[in-house]
Amino acid sequence: MNQDIYTYLHQLQQALQTQQAAILNLEDQVRQLQEELNELKNRPSSSVGKVEYKFDQLKVENLNGTLNIGLNPFSAKGQQIEDLQVDTETLKVNPETETNPDFYQGILQEMHRYLDEEAYNRILHFEQEERTPLDEMYRQMMVDDIKKQMEHRLPYYLSQAQSYEGISTDPDYLRDIIIQAMKQDIDKAFLSFIQHIPGNFRKE
């Protein structure tokens, strides 16, 4: 009987010691958490706030003083296609070309093809060139923003196309010049966007 009592008391003592050790361990953890909490409370507060991305916030000033992001049209001085040596006289286009839906549709199809198949690599190229990596979300936003402007900008490009010998009677030549100008301006818009994007929008 005495042996049984001794064994029971010994086991009880071991259980109490185990519980006491567990309690001490928990107290240490609580103390550590309390210290960390106090440290966080004593740190200077910094509020980032809600970050919203809007292309309008990233507009840059163009040559004539207006704000523009996305697709930069010809400037008033026609400097967007310098390699084509375009002067400032407005082209008198053939009315049939100006109102022909197939003419407009052909240009729009080519520009959408460019945006779908080539624009992404152009953006990556400019990111590497400027050492400014972007998240995928912003790349897609750039392309989508340009797409939304295509149809509305096309008449402006047509009106700003400049006089070349034979261009007013050659719709294919006019089409090629407009497409070249639009592609060049799209690339300039991508580059300008990347150069002016705030640091907190850049990919870490």
Swiss-Prot record:
<comment type="function">
    <text>Required for the formation of functionally normal spores. Could be involved in the establishment of normal spore coat structure and/or permeability, which allows the access of germinants to their receptor.</text>
</comment>
<keyword id="KW-0309">Germination</keyword>
<dbReference type="InterPro" id="IPR019673">
    <property type="entry name" value="Spore_germination_GerPC"/>
</dbReference>
<keyword id="KW-0749">Sporulation</keyword>
<dbReference type="Pfam" id="PF10737">
    <property type="entry name" value="GerPC"/>
</dbReference>
<dbReference type="GO" id="GO:0030435">
    <property type="term" value="P:sporulation resulting in formation of a cellular spore"/>
</dbReference>
<protein>
    <recommendedName>
        <fullName>Probable spore germination protein GerPC</fullName>
    </recommendedName>
</protein>
